[in-house]
Regions:
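Long, acidic/serine-threonine-rich intrinsically disordered regions with weak helical/coil propensity
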Residues: 1-29, 145-149
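Generic helix N-cap/helix-start motif at coil->alpha-helix transitions
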Residues: 11-19, 56-62, 88-94, 122-130
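Residue-level signature for tetratricopeptide repeat
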Residues: 66-70, 135
Length: 150
C-alpha cells in the first residue's frame, strides 16, 4: 500500500511528489478509497506534527485533496472540509474552496467557479509543472511559488 511506502518520508513536499509519481493523473485507474485512506492518515499525521511543533503536511494534504476532488462527488465534501478547516490556516488556504463549491454545484461553471473539467485540468497542469520544477531544481524538492490559483 502507498501509505506504507511513504510514511517514513519526513517532508510533506517529498510525500506529495511520491504520491503524484506513483498515482499519476489517469483518474480512471486511481482508487478513490485509497485516496480517502491516505488523506485520513495525512490528517492524523498533521495533527500529531502540530502537537509536536513540527508542522509540514500542507503540500501533501493539498495534493491528496486535489486527487479526491478529481475522483470525488458531493459525498466527499465533509472530508475536504474537515481537512480544510480542521488543522490551521496554512492548510485552510492550501485547499481550494473552488473544489468544494464545484462538488456542491455539480461541476457547473458559475460566477466564482470554473467548470469541473477546467479545475481538473488546472490541477494536473500545475502538478505536472511542479514535478518538472522539482526534477530540475538545484535545491531538491521545492514547489513552485503558490501564486498559481485555479
Amino acid at each position: 500500500m502507498l501509505y506504507d511506502e511513504a510514511k517514513n518520508v519526513l517532508y510533506a513536499e517529498e510525500r506529495a511528489e511520491f504520491f503524484i509519481r506513483k498515482l499519476g493523473f489517469d483518474f480512471d485507474k486511481i482508487d478513490k478509497n485509497e485516496i480517502i485512506f491516505l488523506l485520513n492518515k495525512e490528517f492524523e499525521r498533521a495533527i500529531t506534527e502540530r502537537e509536536s511543533k513540527f508542522y509540514d503536511s500542507s503540500e501533501c494534504l493539498r495534493v491528496l485533496c486535489g486527487y479526491l476532488y478529481c475522483l470525488g462527488d458531493v459525498s466527499d465534501i465533509p472530508l475536504l472540509e474537515k481537512i480544510k478547516y480542521g488543522i490551521d490556516m496554512n492548510v485552510g488556504t492550501m485547499i481550494d474552496s473552488e473544489w468544494i463549491d464545484s462538488l456542491e454545484n455539480g461541476g457547473i461553471e458559475d460566477k466564482y467557479t470554473q467548470t469541473r473539467k477546467e479545475i481538473i485540468k488546472g490541477f494536473v497542469d500545475y502538478y505536472e509543472s511542479w514535478l518538472w520544477s522539482n526534477q530540475y531544481s538545484d535545491k531538491g524538492n521545492y514547489p513552485l511559488a503558490y501564486s498559481v490559483y485555479f
